[in-house]
């Protein structure tokens, strides 16, 4: 048996409500890596032209024209908000743990994965916005 997981299961079973705090690690576990092979596959032109190595730091680049800036950001949002979740089971498994409970999720994630996995949007607070709103 796994003592920490058993303890967590006991806590969940006895809880009146559950508050989940979720950050970038959960999205990374679901396959949203902002660098590495995924970045090279999705942004080869920006990597070659600008020397970018990941999506996060590229977002701070002072693009010389609005066209180039929005070419980058529209693709970044498409890949991280609208394309299928690479490993959707991460969010589906969490929802299965919470489904019949009084829960609330506080997240810094902007990728809309909670909503796309079926979480009730009235039980979510995404403090850093939502790519779907171009925030």
Per-range role (PLM):
Residues 1-135:
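Conserved catalytic core of sirtuin-type NAD+-dependent deacylases
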């Amino acid at each position: 048996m796994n003592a920490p997981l058993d303890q967590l299961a006991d806590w969940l079973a006895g809880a009146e409500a559950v508050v989940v705090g979720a950050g970038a690690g959960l999205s990374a576990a679901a396959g949203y890596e902002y660098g590495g092979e995924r970045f090279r596959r999705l942004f080869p032109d920006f990597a070659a032209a600008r020397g970018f190595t990941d999506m996060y730091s590229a977002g701070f680049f002072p693009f010389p024209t609005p066209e180039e800036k929005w070419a980058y950001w529209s693709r970044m949002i498409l890949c991280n908000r609208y394309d299928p979740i690479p490993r959707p089971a991460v969010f589906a498994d969490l929802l299965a743990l919470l489904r019949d409970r009084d829960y609330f999720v506080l997240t810094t994630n902007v990728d809309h994965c909670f909503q796309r996995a079926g979480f009730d949007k009235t039980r979510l607070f995404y403090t850093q916005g939502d790519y779907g709103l171009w925030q």
